Amino acid sequence: MAEELGLGFGEAVPVEMLPEGCRHRREARTGLAARSKACLALTCCLLSFPILAGLSTLLMTGQLRIPGKDCMFPTVTEERSAPSAQPVYTPSRDKPKAHLTIMRQTPVPHLKNELAALHWENNLGMAFTKNRMNYTNKFLVIPESGDYFIYSQITFRGTTSECGDISRVRRPKKPDSITVVITKVADSYPEPAHLLTGTKSVCEISSNWFQPIYLGAMFSLEEGDRLMVNVSDISLVDYTKEDKTFFGAFLI
Protein backbone atom coordinates (compact mmCIF):
# COMPACT_ATOMS: atom_id res chain seq x y z
CA MET A 1 0.00 0.00 0.00
CA ALA A 2 1.18 3.63 -0.62
CA GLU A 3 1.46 6.42 1.94
CA GLU A 4 2.49 10.06 1.48
CA LEU A 5 5.45 11.21 3.54
CA GLY A 6 5.90 14.93 4.17
CA LEU A 7 9.46 16.23 3.85
CA GLY A 8 8.87 19.72 5.23
CA PHE A 9 9.27 21.49 1.94
CA GLY A 10 5.58 21.50 1.12
CA GLU A 11 5.86 18.34 -0.92
CA ALA A 12 4.62 14.87 -0.15
CA VAL A 13 6.54 11.74 -1.35
CA PRO A 14 4.61 8.52 -1.76
CA VAL A 15 6.14 5.48 0.06
CA GLU A 16 5.36 1.84 -0.93
CA MET A 17 4.65 -0.32 2.14
CA LEU A 18 4.84 -4.17 2.08
CA PRO A 19 1.72 -5.89 3.15
CA GLU A 20 1.74 -8.17 6.20
CA GLY A 21 1.26 -11.35 4.11
CA CYS A 22 4.55 -10.89 2.30
CA ARG A 23 6.52 -10.78 5.53
CA HIS A 24 4.94 -14.06 6.67
CA ARG A 25 5.85 -15.77 3.42
CA ARG A 26 9.51 -14.72 3.71
CA GLU A 27 9.74 -16.12 7.22
CA ALA A 28 8.14 -19.39 6.05
CA ARG A 29 10.72 -19.79 3.29
CA THR A 30 13.56 -19.23 5.75
CA GLY A 31 12.20 -21.88 8.15
CA LEU A 32 11.75 -24.42 5.34
CA ALA A 33 15.36 -23.99 4.21
CA ALA A 34 16.58 -24.55 7.77
CA ARG A 35 14.53 -27.72 8.10
CA SER A 36 15.87 -29.05 4.74
CA LYS A 37 19.44 -28.58 5.91
CA ALA A 38 18.67 -30.43 9.14
CA CYS A 39 17.10 -33.35 7.25
CA LEU A 40 20.08 -33.55 4.89
CA ALA A 41 22.51 -33.66 7.79
CA LEU A 42 20.49 -36.40 9.49
CA THR A 43 20.35 -38.43 6.26
CA CYS A 44 24.13 -38.19 5.84
CA CYS A 45 24.61 -39.41 9.40
CA LEU A 46 22.29 -42.37 8.86
CA LEU A 47 24.05 -43.34 5.60
CA SER A 48 27.54 -43.02 7.04
CA PHE A 49 26.78 -45.33 9.97
CA PRO A 50 26.56 -48.63 8.01
CA ILE A 51 29.60 -47.61 5.96
CA LEU A 52 31.63 -47.05 9.10
CA ALA A 53 30.31 -50.32 10.54
CA GLY A 54 31.38 -52.20 7.39
CA LEU A 55 34.86 -50.68 7.46
CA SER A 56 35.21 -51.64 11.10
CA THR A 57 34.22 -55.22 10.31
CA LEU A 58 36.76 -55.42 7.48
CA LEU A 59 39.47 -54.09 9.77
CA MET A 60 38.60 -56.64 12.45
CA THR A 61 38.71 -59.57 10.01
CA GLY A 62 42.03 -58.50 8.54
CA GLN A 63 40.70 -58.05 5.00
CA LEU A 64 41.62 -54.34 4.75
CA ARG A 65 45.20 -53.13 5.11
CA ILE A 66 45.57 -49.68 6.59
CA PRO A 67 47.98 -47.50 4.58
CA GLY A 68 51.29 -47.11 6.38
CA LYS A 69 50.73 -50.19 8.53
CA ASP A 70 52.60 -53.45 7.94
CA CYS A 71 50.52 -55.60 10.22
CA MET A 72 47.17 -57.08 9.51
CA PHE A 73 45.10 -59.64 11.30
CA PRO A 74 45.80 -63.19 10.06
CA THR A 75 42.86 -65.03 8.63
CA VAL A 76 42.40 -68.73 8.13
CA THR A 77 40.86 -69.67 4.83
CA GLU A 78 39.95 -73.15 3.71
CA GLU A 79 40.97 -73.89 0.14
CA ARG A 80 38.75 -76.28 -1.71
CA SER A 81 39.93 -77.38 -5.09
CA ALA A 82 37.66 -78.92 -7.64
CA PRO A 83 38.15 -82.68 -8.01
CA SER A 84 40.50 -83.47 -10.88
CA ALA A 85 39.97 -86.30 -13.31
CA GLN A 86 41.92 -89.39 -12.24
CA PRO A 87 42.92 -92.33 -14.45
CA VAL A 88 40.80 -95.38 -14.00
CA TYR A 89 42.67 -97.92 -11.89
CA THR A 90 41.88 -101.59 -12.22
CA PRO A 91 42.74 -103.60 -9.08
CA SER A 92 45.19 -106.42 -9.73
CA ARG A 93 42.63 -109.00 -8.63
CA ASP A 94 40.47 -108.02 -11.63
CA LYS A 95 43.21 -108.10 -14.28
CA PRO A 96 43.66 -111.03 -16.66
CA LYS A 97 46.43 -113.40 -15.57
CA ALA A 98 47.55 -116.96 -16.11
CA HIS A 99 50.25 -119.33 -14.91
CA LEU A 100 50.59 -122.64 -16.76
CA THR A 101 52.70 -125.63 -15.75
CA ILE A 102 54.23 -128.34 -17.89
CA MET A 103 52.57 -131.67 -18.53
CA ARG A 104 53.88 -134.85 -20.13
CA GLN A 105 54.39 -134.26 -23.83
CA THR A 106 53.53 -136.62 -26.65
CA PRO A 107 56.14 -136.27 -29.41
CA VAL A 108 54.60 -135.49 -32.76
CA PRO A 109 56.35 -135.43 -36.11
CA HIS A 110 57.25 -131.98 -37.39
CA LEU A 111 59.39 -130.42 -40.05
CA LYS A 112 63.14 -130.30 -39.58
CA ASN A 113 63.34 -126.52 -39.11
CA GLU A 114 60.04 -126.24 -37.25
CA LEU A 115 59.91 -125.80 -33.47
CA ALA A 116 57.37 -127.93 -31.63
CA ALA A 117 54.72 -126.21 -29.46
CA LEU A 118 54.30 -127.33 -25.84
CA HIS A 119 51.09 -128.45 -24.14
CA TRP A 120 50.31 -126.98 -20.69
CA GLU A 121 48.30 -127.66 -17.55
CA ASN A 122 45.95 -124.76 -16.78
CA ASN A 123 43.84 -125.71 -13.73
CA LEU A 124 45.65 -128.27 -11.54
CA GLY A 125 48.32 -127.71 -8.88
CA MET A 126 49.96 -124.30 -9.25
CA ALA A 127 48.35 -123.66 -12.64
CA PHE A 128 45.47 -121.20 -13.11
CA THR A 129 43.77 -118.84 -15.56
CA LYS A 130 41.81 -115.88 -14.13
CA ASN A 131 39.69 -112.92 -15.21
CA ARG A 132 38.83 -114.04 -18.73
CA MET A 133 42.33 -115.24 -19.60
CA ASN A 134 41.82 -118.44 -21.56
CA TYR A 135 44.00 -121.41 -22.52
CA THR A 136 43.04 -123.53 -25.48
CA ASN A 137 44.91 -125.90 -27.81
CA LYS A 138 48.46 -124.89 -26.75
CA PHE A 139 47.59 -121.18 -26.90
CA LEU A 140 47.15 -118.59 -24.16
CA VAL A 141 44.45 -116.24 -25.49
CA ILE A 142 44.58 -112.53 -24.55
CA PRO A 143 41.10 -111.24 -23.46
CA GLU A 144 41.73 -107.47 -23.63
CA SER A 145 44.23 -105.06 -25.14
CA GLY A 146 47.01 -103.68 -22.95
CA ASP A 147 50.57 -104.11 -21.74
CA TYR A 148 51.35 -107.63 -20.57
CA PHE A 149 54.34 -109.20 -18.90
CA ILE A 150 55.05 -112.55 -20.54
CA TYR A 151 57.41 -115.12 -19.03
CA SER A 152 58.46 -118.73 -19.41
CA GLN A 153 61.08 -121.08 -18.04
CA ILE A 154 61.86 -124.32 -19.85
CA THR A 155 64.18 -126.83 -18.19
CA PHE A 156 65.91 -129.33 -20.44
CA ARG A 157 67.59 -132.50 -19.21
CA GLY A 158 69.71 -135.19 -20.82
CA THR A 159 71.87 -138.17 -19.99
CA THR A 160 74.65 -138.06 -22.57
CA SER A 161 76.62 -135.54 -24.56
CA GLU A 162 76.87 -136.35 -28.22
CA CYS A 163 78.29 -133.28 -29.88
CA GLY A 164 81.43 -132.49 -31.79
CA ASP A 165 82.92 -135.25 -33.89
CA ILE A 166 80.54 -137.98 -32.73
CA SER A 167 79.34 -140.24 -35.49
CA ARG A 168 76.33 -139.16 -37.50
CA VAL A 169 74.55 -142.40 -36.57
CA ARG A 170 74.14 -141.29 -32.95
CA ARG A 171 74.13 -137.55 -33.52
CA PRO A 172 70.41 -137.17 -34.32
CA LYS A 173 69.64 -138.22 -30.72
CA LYS A 174 71.17 -135.06 -29.29
CA PRO A 175 71.35 -131.54 -30.80
CA ASP A 176 74.27 -129.16 -30.40
CA SER A 177 72.03 -126.57 -28.73
CA ILE A 178 68.60 -126.10 -27.19
CA THR A 179 66.23 -123.28 -28.10
CA VAL A 180 63.07 -121.75 -26.59
CA VAL A 181 60.81 -119.26 -28.39
CA ILE A 182 57.71 -117.43 -27.14
CA THR A 183 55.54 -116.86 -30.21
CA LYS A 184 52.59 -114.54 -30.84
CA VAL A 185 49.90 -115.37 -33.36
CA ALA A 186 47.56 -112.52 -34.36
CA ASP A 187 44.69 -112.41 -36.83
CA SER A 188 45.93 -109.03 -38.05
CA TYR A 189 49.37 -110.41 -38.95
CA PRO A 190 49.83 -113.17 -41.53
CA GLU A 191 52.79 -114.93 -39.88
CA PRO A 192 53.63 -115.83 -36.26
CA ALA A 193 55.93 -113.32 -34.53
CA HIS A 194 58.81 -114.39 -32.28
CA LEU A 195 58.59 -112.26 -29.13
CA LEU A 196 61.40 -113.83 -27.08
CA THR A 197 64.12 -116.33 -27.98
CA GLY A 198 66.69 -118.14 -25.83
CA THR A 199 69.41 -120.55 -26.94
CA LYS A 200 72.09 -122.48 -25.06
CA SER A 201 74.82 -124.82 -26.21
CA VAL A 202 74.88 -128.31 -24.68
CA CYS A 203 78.00 -129.69 -26.33
CA GLU A 204 80.19 -129.02 -23.28
CA ILE A 205 77.75 -130.59 -20.83
CA SER A 206 78.57 -134.06 -19.56
CA SER A 207 76.15 -136.84 -18.60
CA ASN A 208 72.99 -136.26 -16.52
CA TRP A 209 72.67 -132.59 -17.26
CA PHE A 210 69.94 -130.02 -16.55
CA GLN A 211 69.76 -126.69 -18.29
CA PRO A 212 67.00 -124.06 -17.70
CA ILE A 213 66.25 -121.21 -20.09
CA TYR A 214 64.23 -118.28 -18.71
CA LEU A 215 62.56 -115.60 -20.83
CA GLY A 216 60.51 -112.62 -19.71
CA ALA A 217 59.58 -109.14 -20.97
CA MET A 218 56.68 -106.69 -21.37
CA PHE A 219 54.72 -106.44 -24.61
CA SER A 220 51.74 -104.50 -25.91
CA LEU A 221 49.12 -107.02 -26.97
CA GLU A 222 45.72 -106.80 -28.62
CA GLU A 223 42.52 -108.59 -27.73
CA GLY A 224 42.49 -112.00 -29.40
CA ASP A 225 46.28 -112.39 -29.65
CA ARG A 226 47.48 -115.94 -28.94
CA LEU A 227 50.72 -116.91 -27.22
CA MET A 228 52.56 -120.24 -27.31
CA VAL A 229 55.98 -121.65 -26.38
CA ASN A 230 58.07 -123.54 -28.93
CA VAL A 231 61.17 -125.65 -28.28
CA SER A 232 63.81 -127.18 -30.50
CA ASP A 233 63.54 -130.68 -28.98
CA ILE A 234 60.36 -131.62 -27.16
CA SER A 235 61.85 -134.92 -25.92
CA LEU A 236 64.42 -133.08 -23.76
CA VAL A 237 61.88 -130.95 -21.84
CA ASP A 238 61.77 -131.75 -18.11
CA TYR A 239 58.11 -132.30 -17.12
CA THR A 240 58.77 -133.98 -13.76
CA LYS A 241 58.08 -130.88 -11.60
CA GLU A 242 55.82 -127.91 -12.21
CA ASP A 243 58.32 -125.43 -10.76
CA LYS A 244 60.93 -126.33 -13.39
CA THR A 245 58.96 -125.66 -16.56
CA PHE A 246 56.17 -123.07 -16.70
CA PHE A 247 54.62 -120.32 -18.82
CA GLY A 248 52.45 -117.31 -17.95
CA ALA A 249 51.31 -113.77 -18.62
CA PHE A 250 49.47 -111.00 -16.77
CA LEU A 251 48.11 -107.55 -17.56
CA ILE A 252 50.15 -104.76 -15.98
Swiss-Prot record:
Cytoplasmic side: 1-39
Disulphide-bridged cysteine pairs: C163-C203
Residue ranges of every copy of the THD domain listed in the record: 96-252
Entry's Gene Ontology cellular component terms: extracellular space; plasma membrane
GO BP, sorted A to Z: cell surface receptor signaling pathway; immune response; positive regulation of canonical NF-kappaB signal transduction; positive regulation of extrinsic apoptotic signaling pathway
Keyword terms, alphabetized: Cytokine, Disulfide bond, Glycoprotein, Membrane, Signal-anchor, Transmembrane, Transmembrane helix
Keyword DNA-binding on entry: no
Pfam families: TNF
SUPFAM superfamilies: TNF-like (SSF49842)
Site note Important for binding TNFRSF6B, residues: S188, E191
Membrane topology of this protein: Single-pass type II membrane protein
Subcellular location: Membrane
Glycosylated residues in this chain: N134, N230
Extracellular side: 61-252
Segments crossing the lipid bilayer: 40-60
GO MF annotation: an example: cytokine activity
PROSITE patterns named among the record's database cross-references: THD_2
Taxonomy, superkingdom: Eukaryota
Family that this chain belongs to: Belongs to the tumor necrosis factor family.
SUBUNIT field: Homotrimer.
Main function: Receptor for TNFRSF25 and TNFRSF6B. Mediates activation of NF-kappa-B. Inhibits vascular endothelial growth and angiogenesis (in vitro). Promotes activation of caspases and apoptosis. Promotes splenocyte alloactivation.
Protein name as catalogued: Tumor necrosis factor ligand superfamily member 15
Organism, scientific name: Rattus norvegicus (Rat)
